[in-house]
Amino acid sequence: MNARNEQLTSRQQEILDFIRQTVESEGRPPTRAEVCSAFGFKSPNAAETHLRALAAKGAILLEEGRARGIRLAEALGLPLVGRVAAGNPILAAEHVEARIQFDPALFSPRADYLLRVRGMSMRDAGILDGDLIAVHRSHEARNGQVVVARIDDDVTVKTLRRNGPIVELLPANPDFDPIVVDTRSAALELEGIMVGLIRTDH
């Protein structure tokens, strides 16, 4: 299973963690110079490249012309993703309906976004049409975990069962059939794992 574009590289994750730690310990974001110093970058351009990549992936917001113009996107609330257009990253701006004030650390592992569930295929797992699931971005998951998966540009929420190259995405409703994917010949990309459920008024 391949990570999609919005997955962070290990260095980007380290920089994001550094920004979080600085905000939590000092009550302010780091400057670009502090990012350079912390990671041993010889040029501010190297830090800027990583910061812009983080901004493009929706992890931070950059404010031009400010020394401390780095803002954690999560500080504005978790992005609520509605319908996902074919071929686009799940956190593309056009998919974000709103930002909802939830502390991502309430979930373990921490949530990266909320996804609005469409349909009743997971009804017997207590996941109903219109519910919001908290999702931790990951391209790895264990058997039995509820995952957000992309198959041929369609995004689905199902329980994962993997047997070698054969992956089954199992519904929790007898009215729906499992989705079986042979990863040797078909594309299956894991977008994340469900880490929480928020019931909405239906």
Curated annotation (Swiss-Prot):
<dbReference type="Pfam" id="PF00717">
    <property type="entry name" value="Peptidase_S24"/>
</dbReference>
<dbReference type="GO" id="GO:0004252">
    <property type="term" value="F:serine-type endopeptidase activity"/>
</dbReference>
<feature type="active site" description="For autocatalytic cleavage activity">
    <location>
        <position position="121"/>
    </location>
</feature>
<keyword id="KW-0068">Autocatalytic cleavage</keyword>
<dbReference type="InterPro" id="IPR006197">
    <property type="entry name" value="Peptidase_S24_LexA"/>
</dbReference>
<keyword id="KW-0805">Transcription regulation</keyword>
<feature type="active site" description="For autocatalytic cleavage activity">
    <location>
        <position position="158"/>
    </location>
</feature>
<dbReference type="InterPro" id="IPR015927">
    <property type="entry name" value="Peptidase_S24_S26A/B/C"/>
</dbReference>
<dbReference type="InterPro" id="IPR006199">
    <property type="entry name" value="LexA_DNA-bd_dom"/>
</dbReference>
<dbReference type="InterPro" id="IPR036390">
    <property type="entry name" value="WH_DNA-bd_sf"/>
</dbReference>
<keyword id="KW-0234">DNA repair</keyword>
<dbReference type="InterPro" id="IPR036388">
    <property type="entry name" value="WH-like_DNA-bd_sf"/>
</dbReference>
<keyword id="KW-0678">Repressor</keyword>
<dbReference type="InterPro" id="IPR039418">
    <property type="entry name" value="LexA-like"/>
</dbReference>
<feature type="site" description="Cleavage; by autolysis">
    <location>
        <begin position="86"/>
        <end position="87"/>
    </location>
</feature>
<dbReference type="GO" id="GO:0045892">
    <property type="term" value="P:negative regulation of DNA-templated transcription"/>
</dbReference>
<dbReference type="InterPro" id="IPR006200">
    <property type="entry name" value="LexA"/>
</dbReference>
<feature type="DNA-binding region" description="H-T-H motif">
    <location>
        <begin position="32"/>
        <end position="52"/>
    </location>
</feature>
<protein>
    <recommendedName>
        <fullName>LexA repressor</fullName>
        <ecNumber>3.4.21.88</ecNumber>
    </recommendedName>
</protein>
<dbReference type="GO" id="GO:0006508">
    <property type="term" value="P:proteolysis"/>
</dbReference>
<dbReference type="GO" id="GO:0006260">
    <property type="term" value="P:DNA replication"/>
</dbReference>
<dbReference type="Pfam" id="PF01726">
    <property type="entry name" value="LexA_DNA_bind"/>
</dbReference>
<comment type="function">
    <text>Represses a number of genes involved in the response to DNA damage (SOS response), including recA and lexA. In the presence of single-stranded DNA, RecA interacts with LexA causing an autocatalytic cleavage which disrupts the DNA-binding part of LexA, leading to derepression of the SOS regulon and eventually DNA repair.</text>
</comment>
<keyword id="KW-0804">Transcription</keyword>
<keyword id="KW-0238">DNA-binding</keyword>
<dbReference type="GO" id="GO:0003677">
    <property type="term" value="F:DNA binding"/>
</dbReference>
<dbReference type="InterPro" id="IPR050077">
    <property type="entry name" value="LexA_repressor"/>
</dbReference>
<keyword id="KW-0742">SOS response</keyword>
<dbReference type="GO" id="GO:0006281">
    <property type="term" value="P:DNA repair"/>
</dbReference>
<dbReference type="InterPro" id="IPR036286">
    <property type="entry name" value="LexA/Signal_pep-like_sf"/>
</dbReference>
<keyword id="KW-0227">DNA damage</keyword>
<comment type="subunit">
    <text>Homodimer.</text>
</comment>
<comment type="similarity">
    <text>Belongs to the peptidase S24 family.</text>
</comment>
<keyword id="KW-0378">Hydrolase</keyword>
<dbReference type="GO" id="GO:0009432">
    <property type="term" value="P:SOS response"/>
</dbReference>
<keyword id="KW-0235">DNA replication</keyword>
